[in-house]
Amino acid sequence: MAPKGKVGTRGKKQIFEENKETLKFYLRIILGANAIYCLVTLVFFYSSASFWAWMALGFSLAVYGASYHSMSSMARASFSEDGSLMDGGMDLNMEQGMAEHLKDVILLTAIVQVLSCFSLYIWSFWLLAPGRALYLLWVNVLGPWFTADSGAPAPELNEKRQRRQERRQMKRL
């Protein structure tokens, strides 16, 4: 049963600690996926490793680097001169936040990278990321913009106001 009342807010220190743990967790995922990929593809099957295997590794490293750097800059905390925590950074575990999408990109890349040890065609699953981005763009930005009313309809005037406006226009002429 859910607790009654207002949901408690989390303090700066708790957000700071959770952000550190989240970054550590995703760094482990990145290092683990790269270790598995390099071990299987570039060590065991070195003789059959093609140019595309190296390109896939470079692509995944670029995606990991950009995503992790964005997450760490979002979670950067600020401290006062005496060393006390002033701001714990943006909450990386916030639902529907940008960090959630970055974490999804890291997880998708790790899964695709490990599965691509069996076949390089698995990298086509990475097209899910731009597909999801286009979906979110349509649902949150473009769809409402295209389907929005062109403007507020003109308020209908009652007869008295309409006659008054007509008289004013006649006086101006």
Curated annotation (Swiss-Prot):
GO terms for biological process: autophagy. It comes from the Eukaryota. It is a multi-pass membrane protein. InterPro entries: SND2/TMEM208 (IPR008506). Keywords: Acetylation, Autophagy, Endoplasmic reticulum, Membrane, Transmembrane, Transmembrane helix. It is found in: Endoplasmic reticulum membrane. The chain crosses the membrane at residues 25-45, 51-68, 105-129. The modification N-acetylmethionine is found at residue 1. GO terms for cellular component: endoplasmic reticulum membrane. Belongs to the TMEM208 family. May function as a negative regulator of endoplasmic reticulum-stress induced autophagy. This is Transmembrane protein 208.
